[in-house]
Structure formats: C-alpha cells, structure tokens
C-alpha cells in the first residue's frame, strides 16, 4: 500500500482487491459483510460447526469476554495473549494458560453468549467440554489413527460416508 499514500480511497480499493490472499484464523469479508472463520473447514464432520459456534458465542458475549480477559490476565493482556498463542501453536491444549481457568472461563462465556441468542446453538460447542477435560482434541485422534495405520487408517476413520 506504499504507493497509495495520501489516496485513502485507492488504498482501500487495493486492500479489498488483495484481502482474500490474507490467511487469518478469522477475518472480516468486507465485500459481503460477513466474518469468515477458516478453521471450520478443517474439522472432522461431527465438529464442523464447533469453531463457528465458539466464535459466534464469544462475539455475542464480547463485553463479558473483554472484562474476563482484563480481570484474569491483567495488564499487558495483549502481549500475554500473543505469547499464549505462540505456545499454543507449539503445544496445543497443553500450553500453559495465561491465567488459571482461562479456557474454562472463555468456553463458559461463549456458551452464555449462544444461550442468550435462544437458538440452541450452544450444543455445537459441547464437544469442547471433552477437549478441556481430557486435554485432547481431534488432531490428537487423527495423529493416533495415522500412527496406527498410515494414510489408509486416517482416511478410513475420518472419511465422510
């Protein structure tokens, strides 16, 4: 966008033209007015709605989520959350949480946000209860399937019939 200094309209148009190349976990789609949650398409079939429901629940409870983060993580929360993200990329669910009960608190707030909507969508985040309790998710299950029998076992276990 360097070539567009001083021309905010041209810079905005260039951004809109190229923004679909940016790979984020979640991003606004300006042209169509939606929020795209990319990890949703990478889940086993029975969990396909879980990331979207979790994201929606957190958005619906945004004020409570913000207060929870500030209250539990404290000052410098952005830096602490970025460090947590880095650790979670490497260690997954086993990464030390930035505060005791952090994930439990976020899941409870997401559930509350979905419940307030009144559509019964909170059922879509139920599988995350097991992830929190057993500290293991679908990626670990897929890894075990692959270790047992390679690609054939993995496809056999996760193929949509």
Identify the residue ranges that each predicted region occupies:
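C-terminal accessory/tail domains of diverse enzymes
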Residues: 1-161
């Amino acid at each position: 966008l360097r070539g567009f200094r001083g021309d905010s309209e041209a810079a905005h148009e260039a951004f809109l033209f190229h923004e679909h190349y940016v790979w984020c976990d979640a991003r606004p789609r300006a042209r169509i007015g939606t929020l795209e949650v990319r990890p949703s398409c990478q889940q086993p079939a029975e969990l396909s709605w879980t990331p979207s429901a979790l994201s929606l629940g957190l958005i619906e409870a945004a004020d409570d989520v913000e207060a929870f983060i500030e209250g539990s993580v404290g000052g410098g929360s952005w830096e602490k959350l970025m460090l947590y993200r880095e650790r979670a990329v490497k260690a997954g669910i086993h990464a030390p949480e930035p505060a005791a009960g952090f994930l439990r608190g976020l899941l409870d707030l997401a559930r509350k946000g979905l419940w307030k909507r009144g559509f019964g969508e909170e059922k879509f985040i139920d599988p995350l209860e097991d992830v929190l309790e057993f500290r293991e998710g679908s990626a670990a299950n897929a890894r075990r399937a692959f270790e047992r029998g390679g690609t054939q076992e993995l496809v056999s276990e996760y193929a949509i019939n």
